[in-house]
């Protein structure tokens, strides 16, 4: 029936639901949950990233760099946070009101993204062994 005492979700899904853009039933459901940022007394909360980069063999690194600078402009960051309900990466850009409603100040886990890649095969083996699907 979709009820649970606790769930794990990316913050932007709750932002979309709170915005009302996913429909009235999603808005009603979102109003029944509370966001909690775990591990604030130790390592911090896991964060996902949406990233962009330039390949070392890119045929047009100058324009690729200009595009990245464009993505990091305050104007584009504001547009992105208002449409994607993700946290901004640029100082001085505030998150959407939906995201801000459950907090903008929390301790982030500083684990290197590279480490996630290194440990991925072990994580997959653990999930396979446990029968996780």
Q: Residue ranges of each PLM-predicted region?
A:
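Extracellular/periplasmic bilobal clamshell ligand-binding domains
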Residues: 97-133
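Solvent-exposed loop/turn segments at secondary-structure junctions
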Residues: 12-15, 40-43, 59, 74-77
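Ligand-binding pocket segment of bilobal, Venus flytrap-like solute-binding proteins
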Residues: 1-38
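Mature extracytoplasmic/periplasmic domains
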Residues: 50-111
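Periplasmic-binding protein-like
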Residues: 27-58
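Generic recognition of short, well-ordered alpha-helical interface segments
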Residues: 9-12, 47-49, 62, 118, ...
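A residue-level structural signature of the nucleotidyltransferase/glycosyltransferase Rossmann-like core
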Residues: 5-6, 46, 69
């Amino acid at each position: 029936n979709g009820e649970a005492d606790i769930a794990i979700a990316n913050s932007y899904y709750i932002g979309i639901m709170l915005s009302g853009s996913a429909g009235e039933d999603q808005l009603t459901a979102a109003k029944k949950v509370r966001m909690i940022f775990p591990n604030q007394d130790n390592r911090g909360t896991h964060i996902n990233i949406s990233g962009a980069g330039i390949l070392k063999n890119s045929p047009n690194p100058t324009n690729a760099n200009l595009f990245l600078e464009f993505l990091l402009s305050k104007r584009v960051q504001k547009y992105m946070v208002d449409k994607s309900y993700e946290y901004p990466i640029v100082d001085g850009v505030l998150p959407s009101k939906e995201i801000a409603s459950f907090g903008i100040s929390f301790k982030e886990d500083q684990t290197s993204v590279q480490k996630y890649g290194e440990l991925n095969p072990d994580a997959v083996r653990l999930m396979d062994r446990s029968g996780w699907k």
